Structures are given as C-alpha cells and as structure tokens.
Amino acid sequence: VMEDAAEAMGSTYKGRQCGTFGEFGALSFNGNKMITTSGGGALICRTEEEAKRTMFFATQARENRPYYYHEHIGYNYRMSNICAGIGRGQMEVVDEHIARRRAIHSLYTEHLNGYKGISVKQNPSEEFDSNFWLTCIEVDPAQCNGKSADDIRLYLETQNVESRLLWRPMHMQ
C-alpha cells in the first residue's frame, strides 16, 4: 500500500505520523505545503533496503561500474541539490510552520463561531491531530440566507482575503 500523505506532514492519527501507515508514504514539498523545495517531495520507506532500492531506480538504475551501464529501466526522479538544500533548511522550521497553521485554524474557528450555516471543519475525533494545512469551512446556504460558498468566496475576495472552493469529488467532475 502506497500512502498518499501529500498534505499531511506533521499530522497524526492515534499518535502515529501520517505517511507511515502504508508500505511507502509520499509527502509533497510543493510551494503551498508545510515546507517547500519549490516542487517534488519525499518517499517514506520502512527499511534501509527499500530506501536503497528506491534510490537506485530513482537515479536511472545505473549499476555501480566505472561507466554507464544499466540492467534495469530507471528514472530520473532526483531532486536538485539546491532544492534539497532549501528543503533541509525548512525542516528546521517545519514545527513552527505547523504551529502557525494550527493557530490560524483556531482564529477562524473563534471568529466564525456563532455564524449560522458556517462551520469550520475540525479534527473528526481526538484520535486525529491535523496540521490544518488548509482551514476548511462548510457553508449551508439554507442557513446563510441563501448565500453559497462561492458567494462568500467572492465577498472575501473584495476584502483581500484569499479563499477558494475545494476539490470536487472525482465522480462529480
């Protein structure tokens, strides 16, 4: 099982880090994530052997010889040294980034509490500890004088508050 934990860096379930539940886990370092390398990500492996095998294929499956020789088809999934250096530097502040996102989520929860038809999504139970990479707000137009999520998004735009509608389920696209 490959666990897609692209947006979950720092989130836990039952005290366990997201990205560690599958045989492999994948994190994203895209520009809008907890840390960035301007793109790319990380593959979480359970064993050193799996990590070495993954790196072998991710670096063109080149055999250890004094010339280019390949017995397998490989790929070029290497991150540049500059981008990796940026990522290593950001690892030093990842906890601060997560704390900031959680604080922002708390502010939205506090300030939107009491508005009929607007709810800020929380952890589904005490077993979860989200990084709150995004603060998600659900709008019930029936309780918001007929205002839809898009109506609210457009209003926020006039106030210079960035927002967007989240992803639609694949079966609804």
Task: Write out the residue ranges for each language-model feature.
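Active-site PLP attachment segment
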Residues: 20-58, 81-84
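PLP-dependent aminotransferase class I/II
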Residues: 12, 48-173
